[in-house]
């Protein structure tokens, strides 16, 4: 008979550093390695509990003074675009989508650099060189794709790259790990379009969710995520409709934080089948 054994990763906590979303706050992350034959199963399980992937690491914010970073996902079947979002889709109808293996290219990096220099020149990724960029794209132990969007050029074969998204494929959805786009095409609202197109990709694939990363009440950088209908957040150990964004201000209070040991104890882990067989 086959036995099931728990996949038991070790969890660690990062040292506090400045929060990129809320001024004057410190961030801290709970993380574990994502590797080995059970990486996909571990990723699928922990993503449902608010974890995100960065290369071969799974992490979840675990700050000492607040719990404002709430994992967010869109219910694909219930999503209804707003009038503005429909205009964004129409405006970008000429873009061509191309899903490729997670392999970095010089064109991608050139677009990435332009995006960072224009939008996040003082951010934590501002100094990434091409080798670090390649590692971000290529170091993935799970099913991942790079989704490229190109626009018409001077000739049919010349289609300039307009936007790129590194996307993970879960058993229940798509996770938008990182996206970037041409900063000179602000009128196209490419950031919004990439999200809308991922909803369509998930719909076509029969996947129920699109994971957007973290929504942070009180953060202007993350406020846009609340504009998408059928949005859920992971709060209090369960997924729930976001409701009114103002209802989640209490997550900024220090008393909203549980001790690290309690957080780890509540994490549900997947089981792995053992290859050993025994006779009754």
UniProtKB/Swiss-Prot annotation:
Matching InterPro entries: Acyl_CoA_acyltransferase, Asp_Glu_LeuTrfase, N-end_Aminoacyl_Trfase, N-end_Aminoacyl_Trfase_C, N-end_Aminoacyl_Trfase_N
Q: What reaction does this catalyse?
A: N-terminal L-glutamyl-[protein] + L-leucyl-tRNA(Leu) = N-terminal L-leucyl-L-glutamyl-[protein] + tRNA(Leu) + H(+); N-terminal L-aspartyl-[protein] + L-leucyl-tRNA(Leu) = N-terminal L-leucyl-L-aspartyl-[protein] + tRNA(Leu) + H(+)
GO biological process per UniProt: ubiquitin-dependent protein catabolic process via the N-end rule pathway
The Gene Ontology CC terms held by the record are: cytoplasm
Specify the domain of life of the species encoding this protein. Bacteria
Give the EC number(s) listed in the UniProt record.
2.3.2.29
Q: Which GO terms describe its molecular function?
A: arginyl-tRNA--protein transferase activity; leucyl-tRNA--protein transferase activity
> Could you tell me where this protein is found in the cell?
Cytoplasm
Name the enzyme's class: transferase
Q: Which UniProt keywords apply?
A: Acyltransferase, Cytoplasm, Transferase
Give the family from UniProt.
Belongs to the R-transferase family. Bpt subfamily.
Q: What does this protein do?
A: Functions in the N-end rule pathway of protein degradation where it conjugates Leu from its aminoacyl-tRNA to the N-termini of proteins containing an N-terminal aspartate or glutamate.
Q: Which PANTHER family match?
A: ARGININE-TRNA-PROTEIN TRANSFERASE 1, ARGINYL-TRNA--PROTEIN TRANSFERASE 1
The identity of this protein, by name, is Aspartate/glutamate leucyltransferase
State the species of origin: Cereibacter sphaeroides (strain ATCC 17023 / DSM 158 / JCM 6121 / CCUG 31486 / LMG 2827 / NBRC 12203 / NCIMB 8253 / ATH 2.4.1.) (Rhodobacter sphaeroides)
